[in-house]
Amino acid sequence: MSWFRALKDTTRSGLSVERKRLEPLVALRGAAGLAIVITVSLTFFGPAVAASSAFGAFQAAIATFQRSWRPRPELAVASGASLGVSTFLGYLTGGHLVLFLALLVLWTFLAGLSWAAGPTIGIIASSNVAMMLVTITLPTSVTAAAGHAAMMVFGGLVQAALVILFPVRRWGAHRDALADALAAEADYARRLRHDPVAPFDGEPLMLARNAAALTPRQARTRPAQLRGARGIAERIRPVLASLADPAVGVPDEGPERERVLELLGAAGSILDAAARAIRHGAPVKVPPAAVATFKTPDTGAILSGPAKRAAARLGSLLTDVLETAGARTDTQHPEPRNENAQLSRPTLVLLLPIAAGAMRRELYRGSPILRHAIRVSAVAAVGYLIGTALPFGHGYWAPMAAVMVMRPDFSQTYSRAVARFGGTLIGVALATGLVQLAHPDTRLSATLAVTCAGLMYLVMRTGQLAAQACIAAYVVFLLGMGGEAWGQTVPERVVLTLVGGLLAMLAYAVYPAWETPRLRTRLADWLLALGRYGAAVIGRYADPGGGNLPDVREALLAARTAELAWQEAASRARTEPVRHRGLSRAAADDAEHALRHIGRVEMLMEAHLPERDATPVPAAARLAKALRTATEDGARAVRERRVPRWQAVRDALADWDGEGVPDRVVRRGAGLLLEALEDLSDALDTDVPPITLKPDAPHTPDDPKPDDRRPDDPKPGAPKPGTSKSGAQKPDDRKPGAPKPGALKPGAPKPGAPKPGAQKPEGPPGPEDRAAQ
């Protein structure tokens, strides 16, 4: 992508306003907390302290809006306390330029590095550094600075208390995550009726798993509907795929296929009903026809083999989902102990060493988080020096704008810079007009500031433009409440905001952290995770007891994590003005399609894992070992820009005995797995041999010239492959059930069909009413 197109796309993204579900009650609660803090501060301490405490309450309320599964009161208290500490330390060093610059560089570096611990911590830390640049100018003594810091902590405590006293959908985010996962599976079941090999985006399941990780206090108060349904939902997906896939299920046509279509439609209706009940905390209302579809005895008479087992398994899992979604007490379907232990979330105190460890692991050359920390600290120092040198008097606007817009990736940094400047112009213009018309006093300015803050809380998820406009107006009214005339803040803020945005954009262009060169590494990590997942699944057939084998569930989760990392990297790379450097967009799309096919085949084999007392399959052990070794070598080849080869897997399949083995699942799945691996090699083999045509030497299309002929091309006059010397067709010596050359591979998309993942949704699926879109 060229720079012009990249700037055009990021500008459009920054100036766009999305339609999102608004939360007026949550916005009203945040504005009420801000009003309480300002009123108390004005009554007892005066306008300057009120402005400082307002910044603390304002930032604490923003922290409660972050997409985090942690309790909201903890976020509010942490935000207010960290801003108070930053303000006090900043004021102590504010009188000495060198000391303050050193503190600013250190604070911004740590804030940039905190993105390694997660986006929530990164956003809170960056916002606190930006707010500190303003709040250190308000106190007039060390004692006053301590008082201002204490009032900022008080603002965070007030917001936390309001969250506890007036909860709005206390478990709403967790309910939405689990309901979105069930709704995504309902949509998947309906799509399988039209496309038996339809892809499935595992992001909703991973989001639900993240939401299921709770602190000990959360685990004690979790609603009964949120216990156990996620684990059941993860087991439903492979059963749906195995029931619909003709490779291991039923034929494409006939009464068996008709029965499978009915079962898939009923499964979609049942999953939608469960998702609706969990989302709203209401009883389950299931269509009677959907339940009757699974209870009819015709299913056992029509289906047989793996399809019959999959149908029975699906009916049992759906029954468990309905019972869990309709549970009103904690005694129904509790999650296993081992799963609860794996999904425990550390408390806020225990999170500190974990976050420090994550930040320490990013201290290596080439880390995108480290490069972001270096960028943001350098820009903050340079911006502060430029703002101080300019004859405006409020030099903190430039570094504040830069720190607020800078993010670890290119598209967000540039789009936020555009939105910041555009929103500042709009907000400042509106605030200036109101000031000139109303000439507000201290209390009216405070009222207008609270109103702007409430509007910002309401529209902050619709886009950066609207949020930045509200923030700009809020700051104008808040500083006006503190005694500064609007004419002293408006012009300089517009100019210095532009300076800060330009510095942020220039810093990323000079010292970037492009994702495009790391695409091969992400692809290799995904391939390696899929190889380990496939080896764990196939190894279960060799040792059904699974005494010393790796856990299939852990391998599956690792593969999903690697897939999400690839999707995020590919999405960022599409917006970067960088050449592909060996992995074009077409090759990346083809490789992604091949890896999705690999994961799907492995999921089908997982759906039919043998019981612990089943007969072992020795050939599966050799195949599992060959697959693990081949994918490790293949991942190394992908990183080194070579084409991976799969001779070890091919040899293991050639030595497969096959007697006493469920051929429709294991052996056929292994063959499909090898085909998908070869598709991956074809996608990465982008070297095309040059073709030279000499106009003075006539030749026919079927007879390449000697200097253009590949080593495996037949000589002129030689019989074509598949025929004898006399031209007669050779008998077909392929194994029964093997696909014909050139035939459509099982699991491959039909000609003209879109590739899986070509248009990935930007977030989790919507409500279950629109799941069949």
Positions of predicted regions on the chain:
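Long, intrinsically disordered, low-complexity regulatory segments adjacent to structured domains
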Residues: 592-595, 599
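Alpha-helical transmembrane segments and their membrane-interface boundaries
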Residues: 1-161, 305, 310, 315-469, ...
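C-terminal functional regions that serve as terminal interaction/effector modules
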Residues: 465-473, 485, 684-686, 690
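All-alpha amphipathic helical-bundle segments outside canonical DNA-binding/catalytic cores
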Residues: 227-228, 585-590
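Long, hydrophobic alpha-helical segments that serve as membrane-spanning/inserting helices
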Residues: 1-31, 35, 43, 64-67, ...
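Hydrophobic core segments of alpha-helical transmembrane domains
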Residues: 108-113, 153-192, 500-512, 522-537
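Hydrophobic, well-ordered secondary-structure elements that form the walls
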Residues: 382, 474, 500, 566, ...
